[in-house]
Amino acid sequence: MSDKKVTITQVRSMIGCTKKQKATIKALGLRRPNNKVEKPDNPCTRGQIRVVQHLVKVEEQ
């Protein structure tokens, strides 16, 4: 197991997004713009980030 983490910041609103994108943002634990969460860096998290890459900013730690 790696201890790598990524910090995900929502930078754009979900207005006008598809249901899949809204569900992905909710699954990541984000609620509104400028909200941050820290998640483990694994393929599952990376896949979720790829779905909403235009709405979030990712920082690796």
From Swiss-Prot:
| Superkingdom per UniProt | Bacteria
Pfam families the record matches? Ribosomal_L30 (PF00327)
Q: Which UniProt keywords apply?
A: Ribonucleoprotein, Ribosomal protein
The GO molecular function terms of this record are: structural constituent of ribosome
Gene Ontology cellular component annotations, sorted alphabetically: cytosolic large ribosomal subunit
| GO terms, biological process | translation
Q: How does it assemble?
A: Part of the 50S ribosomal subunit.
Q: To which protein family does this belong?
A: Belongs to the universal ribosomal protein uL30 family.
Database matches in HAMAP family = Ribosomal_uL30_B
Q: What is this protein called?
A: Large ribosomal subunit protein uL30
Instruction: Please name the source species.
Output: Chlorobium phaeobacteroides (strain BS1)
Gene behind this chain? Answer: rpmD
